[in-house]
Regions:
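Signature for HUH/AEP ssDNA processing cores
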Residues: 45-104
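Eukaryotic short linear interaction motifs
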Residues: 69-71, 107, 122-124
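Amphipathic, alpha-helical segments enriched in basic
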Residues: 36-38, 89, 93, 112
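Histidine-centered divalent-metal-coordination microenvironment in nucleic-acid enzymes
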Residues: 98-121
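Generic alpha-helix detector with strongest preference for long hydrophobic helices that associate
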Residues: 27, 65, 95-96, 111, ...
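Catalytic "initiation/cleavage/transfer" segments centered on a nucleophilic residue
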Residues: 1-57, 77, 120-202
Length: 202
């Protein structure tokens, strides 16, 4: 019987947290570790949210293009930015804050990860919000393909952050989850893109 190749995921120490290093076996040092600009901003935002809001709901969404989409988006975030503008306008009552990152695996099109915080006193679930995001995304693309926005996993993995009540373990879970956005190995380091690869609203 052929033995499976086995390797251990290393960890990255960051401000007392043990975060996954998120790497594929590679000789390219640019594919290892985290973008500290993205990581630092998000972790500071989690701290700010805990100070400013009694309860905040947090999770991460993945937004993809259809497998067959006949437009070259290598140098373009227009579709995503237009969809986000409409989406955020529709959920303004939840007082959203967000950070998005642009990434690419083996697809000809990029995908996006969206870290979203909403007011937990007016929103208890990400299902309706995820459905709204998928609707805006599909309308912007001019296609309807269910599953382009992974919102059910966002609902399943949501984290509730409470001011003065969230323990270090809960905060650590939020930092761990957010750190996925800062991984380097899918940040298009091998493609000459001149477009913004991450953005936040505050």
């Amino acid at each position: 019987m052929k033995r499976l190749k086995k390797w251990v995921l290393p960890y990255y120490p960051y401000q007392g947290y043990q975060l996954p290093l998120y790497w594929y076996p590679s000789s390219d040092p640019n594919c290892l570790g985290h973008d500290l600009n993205i990581l630092d901003y998000g972790v500071q935002h989690i701290t700010n949210i805990l100070q400013k809001r009694y309860c905040s709901l947090f999770s991460v969404f993945t937004i993809c293009f259809p497998r067959v989409f006949p437009v070259d988006t290598t140098q373009d975030n227009t579709y995503f930015c237009n969809a986000m503008e409409l989406f955020l306008r529709g959920i303004a009552f939840t007082h959203p804050s967000y950070i998005w990152v642009r990434e690419r695996n083996d697809s000809i099109h990029q995908h996006y990860h969206l870290a979203l915080w909403v007011d937990g006193s007016v929103c208890k679930s990400f299902i309706a919000i995820g459905e709204a995001l998928e609707c805006r995304w599909c309308n912007t693309l001019g296609v309807y393909t269910p599953g382009l926005v992974e919102y059910r996993s966002a609902e399943y993995n949501k984290i509730e952050l409470y001011r003065d009540r969230s323990d270090l373990e809960t905060i650590g879970q939020a930092v761990y989850k957010y750190s996925y956005l800062s991984k380097l190995y899918t940040k298009e380091t091998d493609i000459n893109t001149n477009v913004k690869h991450w953005h936040h609203n505050r």
